Amino acid sequence: MSADAIPSQIPYVGVGCIVVRDGKLLLVRNQRGFWSTPGGHLEFGESPDVCAARETFEETAVTVRNVEFVAITNDVLADVGKHYLTVWMRGDAEGDSAKVGDAAEIKEIGWFSPDDLPSPLHLYFENLMAGRCWPPSPGNVPFAVTPG
């Protein structure tokens, strides 16, 4: 990368956390109206599993355990000029309560069956669902991943 690269042209690293409880996924609707899993930017020095747990708790007040790697998506949001590499993690919810934790970012949360997801989905989550990820994964395979 050249030293004079424009910061907006450098991809960001995001982390999404697939939270599963009783076969349902915890999803959040952001202020722009798109649904996805809890997630956010990886902070300096932070590992993806810690980021996934932190973001999930900040956005939904849900604690996750057994956090493990699922996939990576390459997400280009041309309309807003952003490019993300999203690291997808999966974790199990502790407890059964969830609430909007960060109202500045999140409008609504809910538990959904993988076969009955709300719309519109955020591009990141859409890419994962479609298997446009590494390692390649068709359809809903990430939701079948269970901790060892």
Where do the language-model regions lie?
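Conserved Nudix-box catalytic region and its N-terminal flanking loop in Nudix hydrolases
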Residues: 21-58
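A structural signal for short, well-ordered beta-strand segments
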Residues: 15-17, 69, 89-91
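A short coil-to-beta-strand element that immediately follows conserved catalytic motifs
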Residues: 63-71
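Acidic, metal-coordinating catalytic segment for phosphate/diphosphate chemistry
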Residues: 1-16
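Nudix hydrolase/Nudix homology domain
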Residues: 30, 34-35, 103-148
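Active-site-adjacent beta-strand/loop module that shapes the phosphate/pyrophosphate-binding cleft
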Residues: 75-99, 125-128, 132-136
